[in-house]
Structures are given as structure tokens and as C-alpha cells.
Curated annotation (Swiss-Prot):
HAMAP family: TruB_bact (MF_01080). It is an enzyme of class 5 (isomerase). Keywords: Isomerase, tRNA processing. Disulfide bonds: none annotated. CDD domains: PseudoU_synth_EcTruB. Its EC number is 5.4.99.25. Responsible for synthesis of pseudouridine from uracil-55 in the psi GC loop of transfer RNAs. Belongs to the pseudouridine synthase TruB family. Type 1 subfamily. One of its GO terms (molecular function) is RNA binding. This is tRNA pseudouridine synthase B.
Length: 288
């Protein structure tokens, strides 16, 4: 069994919990997920099964994520979401939709982002959340992420803590909790993430996702990599690549990759083209 499953993660489960559930349900140990979702969050969590786990990196490196987020103002927590200890509360009822629109302009294109302390980002090989749990002080490393789009969908003028609902399209590694915290800092009110729903992860859409209790739809790898560079192998080339050997291909002599090598309708290998030679890095036996 090899392929991908588009799952809808419910709130309250970790991404690892979902992987463990799938392993047990499908009776296989080869299962991995693409892109961690916080336990409190819900939404699209793609899962790879069997040999498809070796293809995860190719989707993760290019997949943009889309979210619907609700952020509440006037509340600051230790985790930057509603799961953590409340550190401060204040009246933020003076905020308007216009105030929110002004600060959203800070979150377009490539930005530097500080991840939450309650996260799996590692410093000296140790996740930040462990430093926090053990009461150790550590400086979270700033990371560059890309925000393709951020839109105000709704302003909820609740008193004393108003809220907003946002649509966000962003790159891998973006923490929506960090965006919530930074918006609160810019407005000098404090803010925290109240709810998060991931509606898209690369080619995986919320509308097509499977509930955990349903029969899973297994998506063949070939369906997801149609837009990646590819070469078609002859029978002779296939036999050579299958055993890890390189083959000559017709190119302009450029070095590039990753390239997906097909024999018939099946992905046989991924690798690089160096000069006019395709050199396989990973070889697959889908369907065998």
C-alpha cells in the first residue's frame, strides 16, 4: 500500500496521534505526515503511506498552506493560543476594523518571524517547548517565512476583547500563533490565536479530506507530481535505473532537479540531471 491520504485532523489530537491512528487502522508502520498541525488546530493533514513516505520532502518544500484563523485581542497567553496560561488581559474594545487592516500590511512577502516557545523548533538539538516546560530561558531563533496573502474576513466587535477572522496563505514553517502575537504587539493590546483551521496544504484541499472514521481514499503519487520535471524511460533505461544506475537523457546539458523518472504511468525514481545524465537518488517500486 503506497500513496497519500488527505485527512481532516480534529482539534485535540497531535499530528503524531493521527499518524499512530493511521498505522493501527491500516496495519502498517510506514506512515508519515506532511506539515505539523498544533493539537488545538483542525484541518488538512496529509499523510503518506508506504514508499510514498520517501516523497514527503518534495511536497513539503513547495507546498503553500492556507488557513482560516480567529484571533482575539486584549488577551496574552504563554503559548500565544488559548491552550496556555493567561498572562495578561486588558480592554481592547477601542479597536476598529481599520486598525486591523493597517497592521496587516506588515505581513506580506518575506518576513522574519519568531516561533512560539511552545513549539517544536529546536535550539541546540532541543525543542523550545522543553525549555519552556523546564523553566529554562532561551532565545527563539528568528526564521524567514513567506506570507503570500493575508485578508481580514470579519471583525467581531465584542467587548472588552474584540476578535478578527483572517484568511492566510503562507509558506511552510509559518506559525499563525506568531502572527497573532505580533499583531497584538503592533496594536499594543496583546492578542492570541483562538482557533485555527487549515484549509489547504499544497494539492490537498479541505473539501476533499477524509474523516478519521471513514474509509480512506488512497491518492497515487503520480497524481500529485504531474507538474514536476519528468523524464520517460525506455525499457532498457528502466532496468538500469531500477538498479541505481544513471542513464543518458536528452537535455540542454543543464544541471537541475529534482526530476521524476517514469516508466509507463509509474514513478520509478527521483534524482538529478547532471549534464545529460539522469542520476537516481531514490528508487521506487510502486505497484510491485
Amino acid at each position: 500500500m503506497d500513496g497519500f491520504i488527505n485527512l481532516l485532523k480534529p482539534p485535540g489530537m497531535t499530528s503524531h496521534d493521527v499518524v499512530a491512528y493511521v498505522r493501527k487502522k491500516l496495519k502498517t508502520g510506514k506512515v508519515g505526515h506532511l506539515g505539523t498541525l498544533d493539537p488545538a488546530a483542525a484541518g488538512v493533514l496529509p499523510v503518506a503511506v508506504g514508499q510514498a513516505t520517501r516523497l514527503i520532502e518534495y511536497l513539503e518544500n513547495v507546498a503553500m498552506k492556507e488557513y482560516l484563523a480567529e484571533i482575539v485581542f486584549g488577551i496574552t497567553t504563554a503559548t500565544w493560543d488559548m491552550e496556555g496560561e493567561i498572562l495578561e488581559q486588558k480592554d481592547a474594545s477601542f479597536l476598529t476594523a481599520g486598525d486591523i487592516e493597517k497592521v496587516l500590511g506588515h505581513f506580506h512577502g518575506e518576513i522574519e518571524q519568531t516561533p512560539p516557545l511552545a513549539s517544536a523548533v529546536k535550539v541546540s538539538g532541543k525543542p523550545l517547548y522543553r525549555y519552556q516546560r523546564q523553566g529554562e530561558k532561551v532565545e527563539p531563533p528568528k526564521r524567514k517565512v513567506f506570507i503570500d496573502s493575508i485578508e481580514l474576513l470579519e471583525f467581531l466587535a465584542d467587548k472588552p476583547q474584540p476578535a478578527v477572522r483572517l484568511y492566510i496563505r503562507c509558506s511552510r514553517g509559518t506559525y499563525i500563533r506568531s502572527i497573532a502575537n505580533e499583531i497584538g504587539n503592533l496594536l499594543k493590546t496583546g492578542a492570541t490565536l483562538k482557533f485555527l483551521l487549515r484549509t489547504r496544504s499544497g494539492p490537498f484541499l479541505l473539501d476533499d479530506s477524509n474523516l478519521l472514521h471513514e474509509d480512506f481514499t488512497l491518492i497515487p503519487p503520480e497524481q500529485l507530481f504531474q507538474d514536476f520535471p519528468k523524464i520517460n524511460l525506455t525499457r532498457e533505461q528502466y532496468l538500469r535505473v531500477k538498479n541505481g544506475g544513471g542513464v543518458k537523457v536528452e537535455t540542454k546539458g543543464e544541471n537541475f532537479g529534482p526530476v521524476f523518472a517514469y516508466y509507463g504511468e509509474k514513478i520509478i525514481a527521483t534524482g538529478m540531471i547532471c549534464g545529460q545524465i539522469f542520476r537516481p537518488e531514490k528508487v521506487f517500486r510502486f505497484g510491485e
